[in-house]
Amino acid sequence: MWTISGIYFSFNKIEDVRGSQYLRTTEVIETPKGNKIEPQKALLNVADKTFLKPISVVEITEDKAGSEYRGRSLPLYMIETINEENEGINVYLDPFSEEIVAIRSNQWRIWDFMWGIHIMDWNERDNIGNVFLKIFSILALLSALSGIYLFFSSNKKK
């Protein structure tokens, strides 16, 4: 699985996974500090700043382990949208700065799942120093070194 997830990463551009292709080039206009925009304004912002069609908005105030918005400051607005192919895409908007902080599509969800497998952290998908990864990394190195040794030692006998 480690190799399969690594292959997956090498064939998918991180920019596409992060949803850059859905953003329009626009000016950044911030609201006065401390003023939180209304949910309806969040829908309009996403319509203006992306090529996506906003459907609904939910305010997120609690952090959840392994969430699509992990590592972001809360609160956030999660705007549920669809693209031209009617695929559901979540856009996360900072309600104070009106900045889009994350775009999460099915492509991102697959990437995130593969990342969790690749680093062997299935819950948070943030810990690249866990025991499983260290053990399997050492085993992979030993396997590679023994393969190189066997390759060269078998050629000498011929």
Outline where the language-model segments fall.
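Conserved histidines in hydrophobic membrane contexts and catalytic metal-binding motifs
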Residues: 1-158
